Amino acid sequence: MNKKTVKILVPAGALGIPFDKNALINGIKQKPDLIAIDGGSTDSGPYYLGSGKSKYSYSTTKRDWSILMEMRAKAKVPLLIGTAGTCGTKSSVEWMLKITKEIAKENKEKLKIVALKTDLSNKFVLEKYKSGKIKPLEGAPKINEDIINNCSNIVALAGVEQIQKAINTKADIIISGRSTDTAIIASLPIYHGLNIASAWHGAKIAECGALATNNPNSGVVLLEFDHNGFTITPMCKNTKATPQTVFAHMLYENADPYILLEPGGYLDVSNAKYKKHKKNSVRVEGSKWYNKKPYTLKIEGARLVGFQTISIVLIRDPKYIESIDKWIDKLKNSFYRKIKNSILVDVQLELRKIGKDATLGNLEPISIDINEVAVMAIFTANNQEKANDSAKLLNPDLLHLALTKNEPMPTFAFPFSPPEIDKGPLFEFCFHHVIEIDNPKDFFQLQFHKI
């Protein structure tokens, strides 16, 4: 079980993000022990967790996964993906499993596949909540029984113990549900008895592939772990890792650049040393790992809160551009006046200016002259029909509402016909919490598939 060194090849920050195939081939020549790649995150909002769908296209995912499966076969090492299908739900793991089986069938390949399911039932989470085992993190939203029961999907982020159980099956391919970005990399060196702190530290640095180098778009990096530290080497020509690019990645999605919280403990890199190694590599030693009890896993959940339809109108009239805020207020007042005492009375309308203060709003520090502006109307209702009906109700005003009673009726422009675009279900995140567990290794379910 114990090894002196472990090499892990990370092709990209996530499956679906482009990587340099020549760099990948070069990485395979280094004889890695594992190919590991992330499959998603919550970065793209709650829709994907709520719906259990992937943000990446099926064809692109299949193309890139096919390349990685080909490289795995050449290297004769396991291929591991974490947070499969963007959100890591049961349905997205099944989606990834379907792609894997299709590729294997096309290539007439025999495989042993393990799927790690990290979903939690609403009933289980509710029981843990009632027993005080669900703990809020800083800034966590308030939760209650109704919120927990109404979550369409709840997942826990697997740590190294759960990934190691999958690795121990000697599967050719491991498809994991939601996991921490680092656990899929840290698991193998820890499994082989190497430095725990260095395993977590190296995993953090390489979680996004070549983002910790001077050429982030190149994708592929190789990590080599031992008993004292780790070395990171980019596999693309003319790409370098420097002490600065490596340490800087500790700031990425991390509130404290010296502390990294993970299942079962935390990493402290306060005393870590980053040194240039050979031509384009960086050697890192000196980080510390501290176990923490009780053992906790972060949980994520999303629930359906409505349905949305949007309409967009384009305005070029200088008078209306100058008075756009007044016009928006009048538009909103007109809408709420129309829906009063109707079945649409509970519909919410949000109006956003596009092209003027669209990102920062009142905090925008730069004032510039503009010659056109778009207004996006977002209608939120408890069903799609009401959201769409509300958009149709406001249609004439979006196109022709005048600022004052005594001026000619204006005409603006819709970029589409019909202008109403059904956005579909609206989800919101429900948790920023951890769950206390007693049996880390046996907490999730493994499913075995042979092809």
Task: Give the label of every model feature segment.
Residues F19-N22, P46-G50, S91-L97, K123-K133, ...:
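Short acidic, glycine/serine/threonine-rich loops at helix termini
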Residues M1-K29:
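N-terminal amphipathic/basic leader segments beginning at the initiator methionine
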Residues A14-G16, S41-D43, A84-E94, G177-I184, ...:
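Gly/Ser/Thr-rich loops at beta-strand to alpha-helix junctions
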Residues K29-Y47, A75:
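N-terminal glycine-rich anion-binding loops that anchor highly charged ligand groups
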Residues S121-S176:
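An acidic, phosphate/nucleotide-engaging active-site surface
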Residues N2-P11, A36, P78, I154, ...:
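Small-residue-enriched flexible segments
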Residues K293-I451:
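C-terminal non-catalytic interaction/assembly regions of soluble proteins
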Residues L9, S54, V77-G88, I173-I174, ...:
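Short glycine-rich or small-residue beta-strand-to-loop segments that form or flank ligand, phosphate
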